[in-house]
Amino acid sequence: MFKNVCKDLKHDVLLYYIFVDNKTTSPWTEYDIQSTVDSVKVAIRWLEEQARKNNVPLKIKSDYYIGPEFTTVNRNLPQPSVQKSVTEPNLKTGLKNINMWADAIAKRVGTTLNIAAKDGIPDVKNPKNKERLIAYLRDTYQVESVALIFMVNNYFKNDISIQINTFNTEDVEFAVVSYKYPAEIAHNFLHLYGAADMYETAFRRNDSKIDQLQKLFPNEIMMEPYARKLTGLEISDYTQYLIGWKNDYNPAYESLFTDRAYNF
């Protein structure tokens, strides 16, 4: 729980998202951008309402990067899709490549934000470009916790959204989100604070555990979010423990906090 830049999901946090165009996704039109902004607002309202229901103080600020004259950042994915970018030729190399892709985008954004040389970044050797951008955002928005999301427009394609660097402390965590549904955005936002998938993904593969989770939590936001409406979904006590809203958990869940090499 609480790794890197996405710390405690309480009090003031920032959701910052960047629209990215590339040659294999649909272009971001002004309509697409505005409808995504609207979806983010819906997702935030739902998340804050879930927090209130569970007596958790939470205020999510949000903002996004857009260039002059409504221009996006152009940066091709390492492979033709998000899924292939992360998994080919293997997961280890794919994750390295998607981190380089995100750093290049953050660097480009940073050049337009006038990020100073001394902006409060941690004193670490060779800080990544994502780190510098997030340090700037922390200072500008006066928050400790920043959820960084790269939005790609895969609305008419079959692809995935994915969280990166949530299983290590070597780099800042971020998400690549393919779809503008509010549930998709809320789902991936929660990933950055420690929430775990409850369906088959790159990080969740055990069929038996997936079956158990689906029986226990059929209305959970961390189930497959594609095209689902937020109405009727919930943040289960299992997920609340992972994101820090609860200090303990039902012992019956013990085996469900691991999946092969991953500890959630």
Which residues does each predicted region cover?
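Short, solvent-exposed loop/turn elements at domain surfaces
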Residues: 24-28, 158-160, 229-235
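Active-site-proximal beta-strand/loop segments in catalytic clefts of secreted hydrolases
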Residues: 18-22, 150-155, 179-180, 224-226
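Propeptide-to-catalytic entry region of secreted or membrane-anchored zinc metalloproteases
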Residues: 1-140
